[in-house]
Design a protein with these regions (language model features):
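Short Lys/Arg-rich amphipathic alpha-helical segments
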Residues: 1-101
Length: 101
């Protein structure tokens, strides 16, 4: 898996298990959608997005299997990654060009 860092989970939101992600990733529309898999934390735990919405400057995500705030709390402070091969966009992203001559 060629992983790309996309942001950090900075907090929970509400009691239903929603997580608040801060990200400056350019192609958010390509990843923040239902059934897309994000990889969270040092162990890169795969979590499937159930729902997504914007709230202020945050990306609010609800994951499958995260049913309440107690399930969500362990993810607070963790980094979020994607598999580059799962990103379906035309052209290149900045991360593709790093290290090229």
């Amino acid at each position: 898996m060629k992983e790309l860092y996309i942001g950090d989970i900075v907090n929970t939101h509400g009691i239903k298990g929603e997580l608040r992600i801060i990200s400056d990733f350019k192609y958010k529309d390509a990843i923040f959608k239902p059934n897309f898999i994000l990889y969270v934390g040092k162990n890169r735990e795969p979590l499937t997005i159930v729902s997504y919405r914007k709230h202020k400057n945050y990306d609010m995500v609800l994951f499958s299997g995260v049913n309440d705030i107690n399930d969500a709390l362990p993810y607070k402070g963790e980094s979020v990654y994607i598999n580059r091969d799962d990103l379906n966009i035309e052209g290149y992203i900045n991360e593709d060009l790093i290290g090229l001559d």
